[in-house]
Structures are given as C-alpha cells and as structure tokens.
C-alpha cells in the first residue's frame, strides 16, 4: 500500500509539473506571438542638396516606408525598416571646377531600438536610435550623361507620437532623420509622415 501510495503521489507531482511546464510554454509562445508587428507609412521629406546655376533645384519630395518590429517589453521595441525617400534636384561641382546638375534618388534600410512612453490612455511617445545603410544615386542632367551612386552607413533617429485605435492597431505621426552622401554632396534627410502598425 505504501508503495502504491508513493507511486500515486509521484504521479500527481509529475502531472502537476507537466501541466505547469505546458502552461509556461503556452504563455511564452503567446507572448512571443504578441510581440511582433508590421507597418507602413508615407509622407513628405526634405533633403539638403546643393544647387547650381542653370539647373533645377528642389529639396522636397515624398517618401514611403515599411517596417517590422518586435517588442521585448511593453516599452522597448526593436525595429527593422526600409524606406524610399523619393528624389531631389540639385547639383555639384567637379574637382576641375565644372558645375553640373542632376537628380538625387535616395533609399535605404535600417535597424533601430526604441523606447515607448505611454503618457495617457491610448497615447504614447516613442523615441528610437539606430543605423541605416543609405544608397544615393545621382543621375546627371544634360549636357552630361550617366549616373553615380554611393552607399554609406549613417545614424538613424526617430520620434513617433502614436494612438492605439484598437488592441492590435496603432496610428502614428512619425519623424525619421538620417543622412545621405554622393560626390561632395552630403546632408540630412528628414522624413515626416503618418504610419499604421499592426501587432500580432
């Protein structure tokens, strides 16, 4: 009887242990599934390009971005993003002193870590810091032909004011800033727009 009782007690303990392990695994999987998000945004941007006489000059454009995030905690999030900053018209001066004009096309990919502060029900403010690989392609205007491109690693900073419209949906007003470079032209790129984010 004692042996049977011990085996029964051991079986109950094992059952409890297995149940706790299964519950913990389910909770971990649930937490992981709830930590991922995807989103998209669009808006206007401004790129600092040099202007030369006789050629078009336009420092404003439109941008679009796609991003995916993973929330380590309710406040800390990792994000990977890709963006197309459109194009800017400007120019430069060759090493021999010859001015030339053309069009700058800028895009890139980046990673960042952010901290989200919830300051009111549904409202939050997030700041993030990371790095981006920014590609700038310059197409020469007549009378020249051809193009040149350069890819550089640049800092990436962002600020986002968000509102939780539903448990899985967030709308935000985003400001992202990085830099771009080609030839001797280098300067900041600022993107301002709205974004929608879906968590799953």
Walk through the language-model features, giving the residues of each.
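Cleavable N-terminal export/targeting peptides
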Residues: 1-35
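Gram-negative (and chloroplast) outer-membrane scaffold detector with strong preference
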Residues: 34, 41-48, 65-141, 163, ...
């Amino acid at each position: 009887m004692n042996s049977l009782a011990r085996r029964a007690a051991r079986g109950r303990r094992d059952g409890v242990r297995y149940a706790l392990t299964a519950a913990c695994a389910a909770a971990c999987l649930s937490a992981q599934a709830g930590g991922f998000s995807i989103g998209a945004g669009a808006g206007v941007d401004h790129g600092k390009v040099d202007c030369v006489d006789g050629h078009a000059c336009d420092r404003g454009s439109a941008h679009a971005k796609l991003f995916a995030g993973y929330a380590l905690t309710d406040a800390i999030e990792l994000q990977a993003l890709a963006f197309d900053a459109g194009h800017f018209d400007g120019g430069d001066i060759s090493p021999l002193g010859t001015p030339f004009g053309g069009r700058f096309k800028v895009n890139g990919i980046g990673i960042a870590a952010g901290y989200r502060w919830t300051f009111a029900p549904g409202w939050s403010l997030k700041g993030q810091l990371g790095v981006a690989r920014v590609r700038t392609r310059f197409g020469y205007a007549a009378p020249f032909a051809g193009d040149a491109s350069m890819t550089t690693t640049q800092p990436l900073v962002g600020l986002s004011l968000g509102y939780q419209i539903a448990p899985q949906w967030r709308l935000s007003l985003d400001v992202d800033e990085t830099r771009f470079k080609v030839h001797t032209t280098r300067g900041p790129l600022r993107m301002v727009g709205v974004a929608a984010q879906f968590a799953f």
